[in-house]
Each structure stands twice: as C-alpha cells, then as structure tokens.
Amino acid sequence: MPCVNINSGSKINIGAQIHHDCKIGKFVTIAPKAVLLGNVKIADYCYIGANSTVKQNIKIGKGAIVGAGAVVTKNVKSFDVVVGKPAKSIKKNK
C-alpha cells in the first residue's frame, strides 16, 4: 500500500501536494503550492520553495534548497541550492 512518511519537525504549508511513497526527513519545510510527485526522498533540513515541482523518483540531499518555481528533474546533492526550469545548482548552502 502506498504511503507517505513525514518526520518530526517538518512543516507542510497550505496547498502543497505530496504524492505516493514520498519520504520527508526531519526539519524539512515544504512551501505553499509545492508539488512532490511519487517516490520523492527528501533528506533532513531541506527547504522546498513555493510553486516548485519535484518530479518522480528524485532524491534531495541533506540541507538542500529548491528555489521558488523550480522544476527538479534530477537528484539534488546535499547542501546544493537549485533554481530554474529545469533546476540547476547555483551554489552551496553553508
């Protein structure tokens, strides 16, 4: 049976969509109207920006930031800051 796991300290804002089999780490913020398609894995301490989309089977590394409106089509490394359509890394989150 498909399920979603959301760990402690995480915040899911209004209008966000989390589809089947997603796993969300500790202290993750999902901003308003962000969409996580199926089987997305988000590590601890991440921020997913407003109106962003994370495509199926994507992994977001620890401490990563996804900018508002970004479309994530590839895995995001730990502490990367990604923006754009498709999302590309612009710097490290220190």
Residues covered by each model-derived region:
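Generic C-terminal helix-cap and adjacent flexible tail
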Residues: K91-K94
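Structural signal for interior beta-strand "rungs" in well-ordered beta-sheet cores
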Residues: M1-V83, A87-S89
